[in-house]
Swiss-Prot record:
Organism the protein comes from: Coccidioides immitis (strain RS) (Valley fever fungus)
Name of the protein described by the UniProt record: Chromosome segregation in meiosis protein 3
Main location: nucleus
Name of encoding gene: CSM3
Assembly with partners or alone: Component of the fork protection complex (FPC) consisting of TOF1 and CSM3.
Annotated compartments: Nucleus
Biased composition, class Basic and acidic residues, residue ranges: 21-33, 165-174
Amino acid sequence: MAEDTAFDDLFNYDAGIEELLRDPEEEKNDRRASGTGTGSTENKNDDLIGLEEIKITRKRAPPVKLDENRLLSQAGIPKLRRSAKTKLKFKGKRHEFSDVARLLNFYQLWLDDLYPRAKFADGLSIIEKLGHTKRMQVMRKEWIDEGKPGRNLYDSNVTYLDPNSDNRGDKDTADPTIPSIFQRTLEQSAPAMEAHRNDQAESTHSPKRLSDSEIPIFGGGKAISLRNNADDDDDLFVPGNEGMDIDPPVQASQVPEEDDLDTFLAEQESTMQNTAHGLGILKPNAPPADEEDDLDALLAEAENTPARAPKTGHLEANRPAADDFDDELHILNEFGL
């Protein structure tokens, strides 16, 4: 039986000719009508289950813009500042052209990494426009202040401890960005700073107390300080005499007026005259010109007057000429002649 079927197939030349001669459009229409396609079957199955076909579409990434946020990011100016400290080195004098070329190449590489879509000249123009904004001006001022001397000891974003605050000794409230050695130094120096500030306040509001060595022994007058009252810090630069008292300048209210000054001088002059008279060392003033006649008459009378007899009982009637000369000289000395 099987042999007969194989023999018949050998002589059956017309098998499959109709399928080859059939129009492909008709075949597609037949398949659509019968529903034998795989896609239609799957759609029917999805409709029966209640599921809809989910189409996945990939959204295009938004274009990167060169704005303030990108310029201030870690890949922007902060990276430029960090790299310039290590990678950018100049040779100096007689190498100006090569130094400028190296600087431009450094900027070009940085800008290409930051914003590769723009050319170097276009990127520089964009950055120049962004530099006029308020935010960039504030950041530029902060960067300039960080580069000044004396600002490298601490970070710019570190909040320092206030000696007057109540939580200066609390380690939990301290800024974690401060290194431990700086934190320990600030904690140790806070009491000393507060004590120094209190001493300055007391010396300003309370009067200066004089010691026994500063009080004058004769009473009255101003106390003379035996110690220089200048600040001790100034002695490091301006050596001063510690035996001198640096007093404030005399104010206008302390200067005596002219009338008081004249009265004081008159009192001093009268006191000096009385003292000189008491000691017998002050000579009388010269007689005025109108008393010269009286003086001449007195001298003539003294010359004509006979000498008195001595009490010892001598028999001489007149004094010798030497005694008369001495008397005249004594009188002249008394009148200041």
